[in-house]
Design a protein with these regions (language model features):
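Short cysteine-rich clusters marking metal-coordination/redox-active sites
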Residues: 367-370, 385-388
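Short nucleic-acid-contacting surface segments enriched for D/E, G, S/T with interspersed K/R
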Residues: 317-333
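Long, hydrophobic alpha/beta structural blocks
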Residues: 69-276
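Long, charge-rich boundary regions
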Residues: 398-469
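OB-fold (S1/OB) nucleic-acid-binding surfaces
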Residues: 291-316
Length: 469
């Protein structure tokens, strides 16, 4: 067995990054211990109100390595190498002391919202803890109970970071992505980053397995954060083998160090399946549009889907144009976070399943007896001839069909407006393509097996093998 290290809640809005602390832990430990597998960046419930930024915790496995070796990064001019498998190190106390020094040296203790913690486990927490933490709210007692008897725990201040630290070790990937994170020289922290946008565009087009690199709709580089943290840029993708080359394609400020993380970003792990909407969760709702979209002050667009309001907020940019194109009768599936005040679904992705026929009234019905137009008797109350008082139903008006450009299919906000955990449509299409290819391969294998079976002939007793002379 290897040792599992989990760390969380060390950064703040004013600086630091828990992944940078991970690089320091790796640098401190790899003189005496071996890195096993990829370090992990595990995003948890994005709707937690007390999160600092992206609600990401880290998990690192250390031990005595064995098996194949791969290079995952570079720190201090030295390559970071990782083993596929490993055994437990002998000196656990020394490892704990080194992790503690890193956490205590780099955590932003002065920030009232920062409450660091770390755990060192001889066995990771059960996967159920991860699913609770990525989809709901977990307390410290629950997290500590999940690692009781197998952990060294250090909590600082309120110790709230122990929740993410334990949950990060509990992640067993059903789906995964990777991110190569590059970091700035310490003397440049807090200054403006310089990254050549054209090189980011070239990288995005050259490496199709990467995603969320550049916002073409708003002409904005997305791989670089805007906070004063140590991160220079990060490139996310499905194939970790291409990430070093993708990193080298980006021109600009020279990184001080880099490291590839295995992550749950872009997986939709935060979406609760088959659950009723609850505040602070991310759910999937399906229903008919029951009210025409309306624009609120600030540019937010709200409409009613089934029995719930759904909103495309201003930061979703051009995505609001799609939402405004919906109309009563359209059938949609929406994925989003449930807000308590106001009670609404903050739309992350939208699947238009059916586009309704929409008609617009261009005239009131004609009274054939009086040769004049009938008048409306009120909202949805029909019509009445002002002379002979003959009544007409609503359907008697003159209508024309409205041309609608909206097409069925999935839609998402621009690259720069997406959440860390939200699965990009690009990944959804890739998964569907892979499933289709595998289905065809299975079909071809089945066809070959049937063909082989048809060609098989039982030799029978007359053609039994005879002894050779």
């Amino acid at each position: 067995m290897v040792l599992w290290i989990g760390v969380d809640d060390t950064d703040s809005l004013q600086g630091m990054c828990t992944t940078f602390l991970a690089t320091e832990i790796v640098r401190e430990l790899t003189d005496d211990y071996d890195l096993i597998g990829y370090p992990r960046l595990v995003r948890l419930n994005p709707n937690i109100p007390w999160k600092t930024r992206g609600n990401g915790a880290i998990s690192i496995r250390m031990g005595r390595g064995r098996g194949p070796i791969q290079t995952l990064g570079g720190i201090g001019g030295r390559p970071v190498r990782s083993y596929l498998r490993g055994d437990s190190p002998r000196d656990v106390k020394d490892l704990v002391a080194k992790v503690a020094r890193c956490v205590e040296r780099l955590s932003r203790f002065e920030d009232p919202m920062t409450n660091p913690a770390f755990v060192v486990l001889n066995k990771p927490a059960a996967p159920s803890l991860y699913w609770k933490a990525v989809r709901g709210v977990v307390g410290q007692r629950t997290a500590l109970a999940a690692v009781r008897g197998r952990a060294t725990v250090r909590r600082y201040k309120s110790g709230r970071g122990v929740i993410g630290a334990c949950a990060a070790t509990a992640w067993r990937p059903r789906d995964r992505t990777y991110e190569v994170l590059t970091y700035r020289h310490p003397d440049r922290w807090g200054t403006e980053r310089w990254i050549d946008p054209d090189s980011v565009i070239r990288m995005d087009r050259r490496f199709p397995s990467t995603f969320n690199n550049y916002d073409y709709e708003n002409e904005r580089v997305v791989i670089a954060p805007h906070s004063p943290c140590p991160v220079l840029f990060g490139i996310r993708g499905d194939d970790p083998s291409v990430l070093p080359a993708a990193m080298a394609t980006v021109n600009g400020e020279v990184p001080d160090r880099w490291l590839i993380f295995e992550t749950n970003q872009g997986t939709d792990d935060h979406v609760s399946p088959h659950s009723a909407p609850q505040a602070g969760t991310t759910v999937r709702i399906r229903g008919d549009v029951r009210s025409a979209p309306r624009v609120l002050p600030g540019g937010h667009v709200v409409l009613r889907i089934g029995d719930m309001d759904a909103t495309a907020y201003e930061p979703s940019k051009q995505f609001r144009t799609l939402v405004k194109a919906l109309d009563v009768g359209d059938r949609v599936q929406a994925i989003g976070a449930v807000r308590r005040l106001p009670w609404t679904l903050n739309i992350e992705k939208l699947n238009v399943e059916f586009v309704a026929l929409v008609q617009r009234k261009v005239g009131n019905p004609w009274c054939a007896r009086c040769k004049r137009r009938a008048k409306s008797t009120g909202h949805k109350q029909g019509y009445r001839c002002p002379r002979c008082r003959t009544r007409f139903p609503m359907s008697a008006g003159t209508f024309v069909q409205v041309e609608r450009k909206l097409k069925p299919g999935w839609y998402e906000p621009p690259v720069g407006s997406r959440r860390h955990l939200s699965k990009p449509l690009k990944r959804m299409w890739l998964e569907k393509a892979e499933t289709l290819v595998e289905s065809r391969r299975s079909s071809e294998r089945s066809t070959l097996e049937l063909r082989d079976l048809a060609e098989f002939r039982d030799p029978g007793p007359d053609t039994a093998a005879r002894p050779t002379r």
